[in-house]
Amino acid sequence: MGKMAVIAHGGAGPGPERQENLQKAVDVATELLLAGASAIEAAVEACVVLEDDPVFNAGTGGVFRNDGSVLLDASIQTSDGRIGFVIAMPDTPNPIRVAADLLDENINGLTGLGARKWADNRGHANRPVEGREPIEGDGDTVGVIVRDSSGAMACATSTGGCSHRPPGRVGDVPLPGSGFWVDETRSVAATGEGEDITRALLSYRVSSRAESPQCDSLMDAMRWGLNELIPDGASVGLIALGKDGAGVGLSNTVMPWASWTED
């Protein structure tokens, strides 16, 4: 059983300075783990910190779509095989909470107004998200991976979507294997240009690559993913956490990330 650990990223792309903001989320997850929280609880609450911070393109900081709407995606997966995701949710400042509520349901994902109605029935906050204008090169996703004292892992991701996209567009964040992947041995989360991440099925293939005898480490698998699966010029980053050891991050562009590992 590995020691407890947390790793989080604040999106691929230059954007505003956000390293200290990201560290606050890692600190929240750390405090929860030390108090006995599960990987799911710590990952969700750390992601909520990022959704509540308008510097990030997620939750309250979600960017406008082409029509001026703010539609939010989020996902969570656990090392025991559960998944929850929501797509294009309106009026939902913390979509990760809704996604997490799906973990124990007989459905994995919900979209749009159907997701909002389901969230209303579960008592999730329903209030307009003001949104903001896209910033050129803005980071497009937040992600948190946690390993708790039992060795269980959870990955939570959230986004307002890439800048300058139509209201029906779906990126990598809510798509298992693309924006995230968790199994019993490791967890991977991606950020950046969602179409390229999705075409590559990046998170799943990086995780699978780590099993290969040609691969020496998670970092080696991540480097392979960025170099071999992502086209030149596409800005993409990855974070990952194994069943032991510290989390690692790698990007072909600016990607703030922060981590903690139990002493």
Predicted regions: what they are:
Residues 1-263:
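Alpha/propeptide regions of enzymes that mature by internal proteolysis
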